[in-house]
């Protein structure tokens, strides 16, 4: 599995700001969008382009356009919605596929409860977004579902990943690519990433 920890100074700075314990909902939400945007820039750097001719201001002109890449953005509810707009800033025509999975606080196992996927998802590259890759259970369950529907190409975008989650994801889905702004130290006994960001969903939505 390809794992890319994006070490651009802007990303590192913004993730550092997100670690503040008393950060406001507004600021956390803004930063989640901004880092999601920067991760998208990195994750799409290998998209192929082709030459096409358009009508320019002074007649025909040859330009580069992305070649035949249909994209669907897949936010994992609910926290993944906080990164979605950052992706759409770069790919505004992307279709949106929504997957609802929550983590049982007792067992830490993923529990699917909803999905609404783009048509022809088997022909699309899926950019799956979720702020935290902790145990990896929710991400693995999401990829299981997408593969069942015929999707073959995946790029995973997360703000923070734990080594345990990376290992679990690689074991279950070695064919995907993971892009993260930070690889943190470990999980605690409750399955939270240390040092992490806290509960990203609560911070994005202003709930507890």
From Swiss-Prot:
Uracil binds at residues 193, 198-200. Binds 1 Mg(2+) ion per subunit. The magnesium is bound as Mg-PRPP. It catalyses: UMP + diphosphate = 5-phospho-alpha-D-ribose 1-diphosphate + uracil. Transmembrane segments: none annotated. GO terms for biological process: UMP salvage; uracil salvage. It holds the Pfam family UPRTase. GO terms for molecular function: GTP binding; magnesium ion binding; uracil phosphoribosyltransferase activity. It comes from the Bacteria. 5-phospho-alpha-D-ribose 1-diphosphate binds at residues 78, 103, 130-138, 199. Its EC number is 2.4.2.9. Its cofactor is Mg(2+). Coiled coil: none annotated. Pathway: Pyrimidine metabolism; UMP biosynthesis via salvage pathway; UMP from uracil: step 1/1. It is an enzyme of class 2 (transferase). Keywords: Allosteric enzyme, Glycosyltransferase, GTP-binding, Magnesium, Nucleotide-binding, Transferase. Allosterically activated by GTP. Catalyzes the conversion of uracil and 5-phospho-alpha-D-ribose 1-diphosphate (PRPP) to UMP and diphosphate. HAMAP family: Upp_B (MF_01218_B). Belongs to the UPRTase family. This is Uracil phosphoribosyltransferase. The lineage of its organism: Bacteria, Pseudomonadati, Pseudomonadota, Gammaproteobacteria, Vibrionales. The gene is upp.
């Amino acid at each position: 599995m390809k794992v890319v920890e994006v070490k651009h100074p802007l990303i590192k700075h913004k993730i550092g700001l997100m670690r503040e314990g008393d950060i406001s909902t507004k600021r956390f939400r803004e930063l989640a969008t901004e880092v999601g945007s920067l991760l998208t820039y990195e994750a799409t750097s290998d998209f192929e382009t082709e030459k096409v001719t358009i009508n320019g201001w002074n007649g025909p002109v040859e330009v580069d356009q992305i070649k035949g890449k249909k994209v669907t953005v897949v936010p994992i509810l609910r926290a993944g919605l906080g990164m979605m707009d950052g992706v759409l800033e770069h790919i505004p025509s992307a279709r949106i596929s929504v997957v609802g999975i929550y983590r049982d606080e007792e067992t830490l196992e993923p529990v699917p409860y909803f999905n609404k996927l783009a048509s022809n998802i088997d022909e699309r590259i899926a950019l799956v977004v979720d702020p935290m890759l902790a145990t990896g259970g929710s991400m693995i369950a999401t990829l299981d579902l997408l593969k069942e529907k015929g999707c073959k190409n995946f790029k995973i975008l997360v703000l923070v990943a734990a080594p345990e989650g990376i290992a679990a994801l690689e074991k279950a889905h070695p064919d995907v690519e993971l892009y993260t702004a930070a690889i943190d130290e470990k999980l605690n006994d409750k399955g939270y990433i240390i040092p992490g960001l806290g509960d990203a969903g609560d911070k994005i939505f202003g709930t507890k």
